[in-house]
From Swiss-Prot:
It comes from the Bacteria. Part of the 30S ribosomal subunit. Contacts proteins S5 and S12. SUPFAM superfamilies: Ribosomal protein S8. One of its GO terms (cellular component) is ribonucleoprotein complex. One of the primary rRNA binding proteins, it binds directly to 16S rRNA central domain where it helps coordinate assembly of the platform of the 30S subunit. It comes from Corynebacterium kroppenstedtii (strain DSM 44385 / JCM 11950 / CIP 105744 / CCUG 35717). This is Small ribosomal subunit protein uS8.
């Protein structure tokens, strides 16, 4: 059975693994998921990620990040734009997550960017998710 929303599935897996204090989480890989993982690593929400090439398909393995007392780096994730309801934002009306403490992941014509990067470049796009 095919997945309707693979991005929501990825974010749910990462959130559930973080809430259960798992060290790693694996999922089927795609270019979009790898770019989202790059943004999460760049912003400090995950420790690392690897793409493993198998015979059947590629697997994305994300290593979760915790503080010294096992505090989660990833407090919450929310999927904004879905296949049934796309949400777009202009460059002048980009969302801020928790007053700038979180990150909005935006799909633009220049690739996947955070809300800060998109506002610096002056581009808008589809708001994929909020991470805090």
């Amino acid at each position: 059975m095919t997945m309707t929303d693979p991005i929501a599935d990825m974010l749910s897996r990462v959130r559930n693994a973080s809430n259960a204090y798992h060290d790693t989480v694996s999922m089927p890989s795609s270019n979009l998921k790898v770019h989202i993982a790059e943004i999460l690593k760049q912003e400090g929400y995950i420790a690392d990620f690897t793409v493993e090439d198998a015979k059947v398909g590629k697997t994305l393995t994300i290593e979760l990040k915790y503080g010294s007392t096992r505090q989660r780096s990833l407090s919450g994730v929310r999927r904004v734009s879905s296949p049934g309801l796309r949400v777009y934002a202009k460059s002048t009306n980009l969302p801020q997550v928790l007053g700038g403490l979180g990150v909005a992941i935006i799909s633009t014509s220049q690739g996947l960017l955070t809300d800060r990067q998109a506002s610096e470049k002056g581009v808008g796009g589809e708001v994929l998710a909020y991470v805090w």
